[in-house]
Amino acid sequence: MEKRGVGLVFQNYSLYPHMTVRQNICFPLESRKEMKKTAREARALELAKLVRVEELMDRRPGQLSGGQQQRVAIARALAKEPRILLLDEPLSNLDARLRLEMREEIRRIQQETHVTTVFVTHDQEEAMSISDEVVLLKDGRVQQVAAPQVLYDEPANLFAATFLGTPPICIVNGVVENGMVRAGEDTVCIAGVETLENGRSICLGLRCESLRVARADEASDLTAVIRSKYVIGRDALAIFELDGQIVRFYLPEEIAHIAEGDSVPLRLRNKGVYVFDRESGERLV
């Protein structure tokens, strides 16, 4: 890896416990015989400042928090100025607060060093917040390559749509019927479905933001009988069932008082609504 110009950082940090922070960062440079000790230590201090651990140079790994240890591991990986930095689930061992902090730090470090960085993660939030481009894999096969927002807004298939998004996208089985989607007793008109053959089995994907409450002067696409509602921070979500599947949508403040059992007329927005082939998972609309 060293000869290929690749720096590695893993989730377990892999720091030498008997060495100080300074010695750990300097260690990859020891093989450079032409590099004087003062130059190695200057490089170590430069990297320590980059990852903001310069005040911890004389401490050993056992005296550092998990986040601090990961910063040192990144500094050590950057010591030899690699062409590529590979981060293999580097935040898995950190608690939620530190993960958020380190996500921001890794993004900053990459932007300051301009080193091409490959970040391996199973966490969609990490992928979406850190990356310029996401490669989404399933069973070793590439499902989609796109910028984070494009991946969210324009999923290539059912797997991509269900992998990204919190709360997750709601998937309802349906059938194309006379240019519309029939799901159970409900029929929904969706632009683009009219081009699909009658009787085709599909999956209807609805993100929380895809539904809004219909105004009094307009027709509704669906009538939701509210099963429950709950609050996540500043957002209120209501839950109803469509052909036995749970569907969620955001409640505006003016009707946040609705109760279980109430009927609410809904309209589909122009975004967050997808139609997938039920067998292949390919996105159709």
Indicate where each model-derived feature is located:
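ABC ATPase nucleotide-binding domains
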Residues: 1-159
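Ser/Thr- (and often Asn-) enriched beta-sheet segments in non-cytosolic proteins
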Residues: 4, 175, 180-182
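Short glycine-rich loop/turn motifs that provide flexible caps or phosphate-binding loops at active sites
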Residues: 6, 27, 65-66, 139, ...
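Residues that scaffold the ATP/ADP-binding catalytic core of kinase and kinase-like folds
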Residues: 101, 154, 162-163, 214, ...
